From Swiss-Prot:
Catalytic activity from the UniProt record: acetate + ATP = acetyl phosphate + ADP
SUPFAM superfamilies: Actin-like ATPase domain
Lineage, top ranks: Bacteria, Bacillati, Actinomycetota, Actinomycetes, Mycobacteriales
Pathway: Metabolic intermediate biosynthesis; acetyl-CoA biosynthesis; acetyl-CoA from acetate: step 1/2
Compartment annotation: Cytoplasm
Entry-linked InterPro entries: Ac/propionate_kinase (IPR004372), Aliphatic_acid_kin_short-chain (IPR000890), Aliphatic_acid_kinase_CS (IPR023865), ATPase_NBD (IPR043129)
HAMAP family reported in the protein's UniProt record: Acetate_kinase
Reported function: Catalyzes the formation of acetyl phosphate from acetate and ATP. Can also catalyze the reverse reaction.
Site (Transition state stabilizer): residue numbering on this chain: H169, R230
GO MF term (any one): acetate kinase activity
Record organism: Mycobacterium avium (strain 104)
Protein name according to UniProt: Acetate kinase
Superkingdom in the source lineage: Bacteria
Keyword Nucleotide-binding: yes
Amino acid sequence: MDGSDGARRVLVINSGSSSLKFQLVDPESGVAASTGIVERIGEESSPVPDHDAALRRAFDMLAGDGVDLNTAGLVAVGHRVVHGGNTFYRPTVLDDAVIARLHELSELAPLHNPPALLGIEVARRLLPGIAHVAVFDTGFFHDLPPAAATYAIDRELADRWQIRRYGFHGTSHRYVSEQAAAFLDRPLRGLKQIVLHLGNGCSASAIAGTRPLDTSMGLTPLEGLVMGTRSGDIDPSVVSYLCHTAGMGVDDVESMLNHRSGVVGLSGVRDFRRLRELIESGDGAAQLAYSVFTHRLRKYIGAYLAVLGHTDVISFTAGIGENDAAVRRDAVSGMEELGIVLDERRNLPGAKGARQISADDSPITVLVVPTNEELAIARDCVRVLGG
């Protein structure tokens, strides 16, 4: 690909601690010229010792797809950054001052922001002549109503240490809400929606028009729904209890809640396909994990129906939401009195693309809407650069 088609493209990078995902996409058409992932960064015996090597490997993979970044019409590099704190909530062109401030904010997201910053620094060094733009997971939820954003703790402490509900997966929630409106051929501003982003990380949001009214994740991505490895909502006293009675340190408890809890903590597996196999074999732990997962999901759906007052549409998205028909069914079964009537003939496993899975006479429309965070980030980049 030599860029002779005149398309402008954005290289979107999602840099994690042990993996780097990338996609080269045309923000106008939505067509991806190349997409891939570099894994096992920094692991023992890995051929990818650090993020510099990872990005160079990504460039090799792009070249293998016939992409020459020098002639591909590249106009920007978009970086997914999980946490922008109270400072950054709009797509932001990266410079030394912005990066320095992001380093200061890393305490708010110690698991996510540092590897993103590593990816940014390497990408700026290897692609110095291109604009680099950060798009923040927390941005969409910056203007949550105070009643939803505020934790009922000592106000002085909260203000001093920027403790509030920030929310995450914001790029996905915004994109899916827009796509749902387009699918229904209805104005976005007139819709009240619940979006359920269900992947290894899971989050829910209640959205009125273009404004989110509530979301399940909080100061960090640990709060809310049960997830693949995260506990979601939990009594905060569990932390002090384990510290005092089990002799665990705070960091150990936090690591357990983030990496050894949720579905994997209850069942030993986090992949829902494997979980389903265990359930079918009669594994009680797997069944309990599934029941806890769907119970929490149903609680949030019910809560957000109340927050919105009137709901027009519920959208399932991300890996589990898009592909697991049983989760979708069990999330809303028995809610006919609340206005949700699923059509089992439409709620099929293996179906692709945006689709309706509720009955035609269901007061609340239920959709499956594939997310595309890379495309949303690419479009944000072009927008902030004035394209």
